[in-house]
C-alpha cells in the first residue's frame, strides 16, 4: 500500500485536446498535485498565421500550471526538465506515442486513458471507428504503458451503450466525462493500493487507424446502413463527404452530417448508386440496397444547413 495523501502524489499530465482537459480539470479541482503538463507545440493556423494553443495548454495557463511543449520527446534537455519535477506518476490522454525513456521515468509508472474497450480499437481514432462500424457499445480503459502501443495491462474499464441515432460528437462527450471519472478512480486506487491490473487478451482485434480525407468519402455503392454509420461516425468532425453534380453538371464537394433510412420516396425510373431523388424539401441518395435521406449538409464554401434550405438554391443531379 502506498502511504501518502493525494496532495503528496506528484503527477505530470500529458495531453492535447478537449477530451484530455476534462480529466485534467477533475484532477486539479479535486486537489490532486499536478506539478506540470506536457502538450503539443503551438500550431500556426488561419490566414493570419496565428499561433494556436492546444486545449490542455489553455487550461494549464489559466490554472498556473507549468507547460512543457517539446518537439522531440527524446530531446535530452526535455527529458532532464521532465525528470527535474520528480513526479511519482504520469497520466497520458490523447497525446503522442511516448518513448520508453519518458514513460518509464516515474516510480509508479505511466497510465493512459483510451477511448475504447481495449483490446478493441487500438489506435488514433477509437470513437470514430466504433460508430462507423455500427457498434452498440463502447467505453473507456485505463492501462499502464509498455512498448507496443495500446497493449499494456488494464487497470479499469467502463462501458456505455451507443444509441442508433447518436453521432461521434455525442459519444465523444459522454466518454470524455466517463473517462475523467475513471482517471480519478484509477489514481485513487493507486494511492490506496487497491488497484489491480490484468493483461489484455491475445488475438486479432479491430483497429482504429487515423482518419484521413479518403476515409471520409462516401461510397454510395455500399449498403445504406453502412453509409449512415459512416456519416454518424464522422459527424460533426471531420464529416463524411461526397462529390455532387448540379443540373449543369458542375461538381462540388458536399459534407453530410445527418441522414436517415428512406422508404417513402419513389422514383419512376430505376436508380443506380449515387442517383438522387428530390422533392421541394427533401433529398435522398440511392445506395446499394435502398435510399438514404440527407437531413443536414454543407456545400463547399457555404455554411451548414438543412436539406430544405439547401434545395432553395441548388438543383442536385447525382452524387459521385
List the model feature ranges, each with a label.
Residues 9-12, 86-90:
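Short active-site oxyanion
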Residues 202-320:
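Internal anion-binding site segments
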Residues 10, 33, 64-66, 109:
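Conserved beta-strand segments of alpha/beta enzyme cores
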Residues 18, 29-33, 40, 89-210, ...:
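Donor/substrate-binding cores of folate-linked one-carbon enzymes
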Amino acid at each position: 500500500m502506498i502511504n501518502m495523501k493525494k496532495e503528496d502524489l506528484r503527477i505530470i499530465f500529458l495531453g492535447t485536446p478537449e477530451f484530455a482537459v476534462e480529466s485534467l480539470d477533475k484532477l486539479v479541482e479535486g486537489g490532486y498535485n499536478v506539478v506540470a503538463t506536457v502538450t503539443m507545440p503551438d500550431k500556426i493556423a488561419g490566414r493570419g498565421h496565428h499561433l494556436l494553443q492546444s486545449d490542455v495548454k489553455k487550461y494549464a495557463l489559466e490554472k498556473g500550471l507549468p507547460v512543457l511543449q517539446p518537439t522531440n520527446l527524446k530531446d535530452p534537455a526535455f527529458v532532464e526538465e521532465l525528470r527535474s519535477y520528480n513526479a511519482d506518476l504520469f497520466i497520458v490522454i490523447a497525446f503522442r506515442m511516448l518513448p520508453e525513456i519518458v514513460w518509464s521515468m516515474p516510480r509508479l509508472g505511466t497510465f493512459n486513458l483510451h477511448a475504447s474497450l481495449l483490446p478493441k480499437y487500438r489506435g488514433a481514432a477509437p470513437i470514430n471507428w466504433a460508430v462507423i462500424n455500427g457498434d452498440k457499445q463502447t467505453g473507456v480503459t485505463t492501462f499502464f504503458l509498455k512498448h507496443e502501443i495500446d497493449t499494456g495491462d488494464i487497470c479499469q474499464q467502463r462501458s456505455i451503450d451507443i444509441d442508433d441515432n447518436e453521432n461521434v460528437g455525442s459519444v465523444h462527450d459522454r466518454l470524455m466525462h466517463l473517462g475523467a471519472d475513471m482517471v480519478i478512480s484509477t489514481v485513487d486506487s493507486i494511492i490506496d493500493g487497491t488497484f489491480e491490473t490484468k493483461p489484455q487478451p491475445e488475438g486479432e482485434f479491430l483497429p482504429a487507424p487515423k482518419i484521413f480525407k479518403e476515409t471520409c468519402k462516401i461510397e454510395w455503392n455500399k449498403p445504406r446502413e453502412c453509409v449512415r454509420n459512416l456519416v454518424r461516425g464522422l459527424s460533426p468532425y471531420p464529416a463524411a463527404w461526397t462529390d455532387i453534380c448540379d443540373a449543369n453538371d458542375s461538381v462540388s464537394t458536399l459534407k453530410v452530417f445527418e441522414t436517415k433510412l428512406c422508404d417513402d420516396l419513389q422514383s419512376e425510373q430505376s436508380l443506380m448508386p449515387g442517383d438522387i431523388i428530390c422533392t421541394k424539401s427533401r433529398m435522398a441518395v440511392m445506395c446499394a440496397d435502398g435510399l438514404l435521406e440527407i437531413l443536414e449538409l454543407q456545400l463547399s464554401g457555404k455554411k451548414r444547413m438543412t436539406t430544405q434550405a439547401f434545395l432553395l438554391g441548388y438543383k442536385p443531379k447525382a452524387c459521385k
